[in-house]
């Protein structure tokens, strides 16, 4: 599971903080452009291989829009 929240959008760039497995002690950060392409990321300590950052990127790419906050669950 992955929780995320929008920190802000500046000049068409959305910045999100994400929390692998809901761990708010060790957030990561991802920035997307207005075409839903990842610009850069800072992985969480719980996400050294950027697995969760990649999940978030693909989620927004498929949805075609940004949300304020939410979670993604998979099985």
Positions of PLM-derived features:
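Sparse, context-dependent recognition of short Cys/His-centered cofactor- or disulfide-binding micro-motifs
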Residues: 1-3, 15-17, 51, 56-59
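N-terminal start-of-chain detector that recognizes signal peptides
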Residues: 1-5, 43-46
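N-terminal acidic leader/helix
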Residues: 2-30
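Acidic, low-complexity intrinsically disordered segments
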Residues: 29-75
């Amino acid at each position: 599971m992955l929780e995320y929240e929008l920190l802000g959008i500046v000049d068409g760039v959305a910045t999100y903080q994400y929390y692998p497995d809901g761990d708010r002690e060790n957030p990561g950060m991802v920035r997307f452009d207005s075409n839903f392409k990842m610009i850069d990321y800072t992985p969480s300590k719980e996400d050294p291989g950027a697995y969760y950052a990649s999940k978030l990127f693909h989620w927004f790419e498929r949805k075609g829009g940004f949300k304020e906050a939410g979670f993604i669950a998979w099985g």
